[in-house]
């Protein structure tokens, strides 16, 4: 078979599996955005450590390294580009199936093509961001330099941005689903904006993982013990 299958790529493959399952489960029936957010966090967890794990193998060939870069970007597009869109679609459909309330009426009054446009803009921005990062990473590799900063918001930030928004819906006691799509547009703009972010070290990664784990636990609590399922 073509490709590579040693332990250095397992987390990337697991992230893609999590994203794929999340996409289908999220869009089942009336829509389950909270479940989708849980899968999104799992993708973020895998992404946080896939590079660290890959670098533990000594003597990786240039082909193995390039393969790892390619599958990482392709997986990120599915996990942090497509899955948040599916969560947004599930959010729209779950609101449509709720009992009448002012927020649901607001959602119903907006033509669905508007939401599709938001989804397209978001995925396109994520793809452009990933492709641009690959170009810069390849140039740095040719010069023998390590990537120390990111240009634009990394797409993996989606794993920590969207789940808290779903939790916020419960904390405020009312449906603020419409703002999810505004956040998507803002994040899309940040993906392609020209500003630099320092690449986090191990300590920074562990802090983000801790935040993600907390979000994951809270989402499960809300999903199974909350007053209502969204």
Annotate each language-model stretch with its function:
Residues 11-17, 39-42, 78-81, 117-124, ...:
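Lipid-exposed faces of alpha-helical membrane segments in multi-pass integral membrane proteins
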Residues 9-13, 56-130:
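Multi-pass membrane catalytic core of lipid/isoprenoid biosynthesis enzymes
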Residues 138-230:
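C-terminal membrane-associated helical module and adjoining short loops/tails
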Residues 1-51, 190-230:
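Topogenic membrane-insertion module of multi-pass membrane proteins
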Residues 16-25, 50-54, 93, 100-102, ...:
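Hydrophobic alpha-helical transmembrane segments
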Residues 21-37, 84-119, 165-179, 221-230:
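Helix-coil boundary and interhelical linker segments in multi-pass alpha-helical membrane proteins
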Residues 1-16, 55-78, 130-157, 193-207:
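Interhelical loop and helix-boundary elements at the membrane-water interface
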């Amino acid at each position: 078979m073509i490709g590579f299958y040693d332990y250095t790529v397992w987390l990337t493959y697991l992230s893609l599996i999590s994203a794929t399952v999340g996409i289908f489960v999220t869009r089942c029936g009336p829509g389950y955005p909270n479940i989708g957010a849980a899968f999104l966090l799992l993708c973020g967890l895998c992404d946080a450590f896939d590079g660290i794990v890959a670098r533990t193998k000594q003597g990786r060939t240039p082909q193995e390294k390039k393969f790892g870069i390619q599958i990482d970007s392709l997986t990120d597009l599915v996990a942090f580009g497509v899955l948040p869109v599916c969560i947004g679609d599930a959010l729209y459909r779950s609101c449509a199936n709720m009992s009448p309330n002012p927020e649901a009426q607001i959602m119903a009054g907006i033509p669905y093509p508007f939401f599709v446009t938001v989804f397209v803009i978001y995925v396109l921005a994520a793809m452009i961001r990933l492709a641009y990062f690959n170009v810069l990473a390849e140039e740095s590799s040719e010069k023998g330099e390590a990537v120390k900063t990111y240009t634009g918001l990394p797409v993996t930030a989606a794993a920590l941005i969207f789940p808290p928004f779903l939790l916020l819906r419960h904390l405020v006691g009312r449906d603020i689903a419409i703002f999810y799509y505004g956040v998507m547009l803002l994040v899309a703009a940040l993906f392609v904006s020209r500003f630099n972010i320092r690449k986090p070290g191990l300590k920074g990664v562990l802090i983000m993982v801790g935040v993600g784990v907390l979000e994951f636990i809270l989402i499960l609590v809300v999903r199974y013990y909350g007053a209502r399922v969204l």
